[in-house]
Amino acid sequence: MYPYILFVLLFVLNACGNVPPDSYTAPRSPEVVARGAHLVKGLAACGFCHGVSSAPTSPLAGGRQVYDLYGAVESPNITPSKSGIGLFSDQQIEQSIRGIWKDAADKRSPTIHRGHEWLSSSDALAINAYLRSLTPINHVVKERRIGFASRNSTGLFSAAATVTGHVADTNPHDKIPYGKYLVNHVARCGSCHTTEASVFSSERYLAGGKIIRVNTQQYVAPPLVGTAQTMNTWSEPAIIEFFKAGKRPDGMQVKSEACPVTFYRQASDEEVTAMMLYLRSLS
């Protein structure tokens, strides 16, 4: 009798735990939408690629040329129109934020959202809620195809993790861990500033050297750690000044087309302080 009851219980629990992935509906409360807006216009800097122009207030209709592992590509429309994300389920939007594409494995780099794979579930759902709240813009963006040879010979050392389960929040009151979360998974500083692995060397965290292409210009991402002049050695006010004003200690203004400093200015004082404390904790 008891084995039979146990079997039934396991069957019911398994059935309840395997709800069709597209069936859940993300929260849409004003508080959740506001959190999403804060992230999209701030540290997550979605408009840096998806905006009609690279500005926090620009419509997110895509179409601007950006670069990934395979070269030039037009950024997708992420407004809730049929030509954007309007036909996506909530789960598909969350997965796209994490770099798991709905049906476009042959169109985009698997690392274009690298870092966001560990975005907390609540933050991913907040971004989803905000994007859903936007005015739909019907703007069809040309899709790119990547050939078999390129897909299987490019970026062999740049694979991103695939995260499909729940990702817990990081407590904002734990300043250094929260700063680490913001640096790595919201602002994704490593997507530009981490040295990529190669046949002869392993990846080096925030060590710089990556070529950033913007239109006809090229920039080399500087290291954030590793020398006596890198950001982790700056004073607390200097790091805060960088995030709030886009200015380095030497007075040089950071180019907003190469780094999303105009988005970083929207970050809260608490977020900037946490990031500063984390960066200063690095040796």
Language-model features, listed with the residues they occupy:
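The canonical Cys-X-X-Cys-His
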Residues: 36, 43-53, 127, 179-182, ...
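Extended, well-folded interaction surfaces typified by the phenylalanyl-tRNA synthetase beta subunit core
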Residues: 139-152
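C-terminal motif of bacterial Sec signal peptides marking the signal peptidase cleavage site
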Residues: 14-15
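Extended amphipathic alpha-helical interaction segments
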Residues: 148, 163-171, 181, 191-201
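Axial heme c-ligation environment in periplasmic c-type cytochrome domains
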Residues: 72-87, 98-124, 221-233, 245-270
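Ligand-binding pocket scaffold of soluble enzyme catalytic domains
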Residues: 127, 131-134, 138, 236, ...
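Sec-dependent signal peptide recognition
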Residues: 1-8
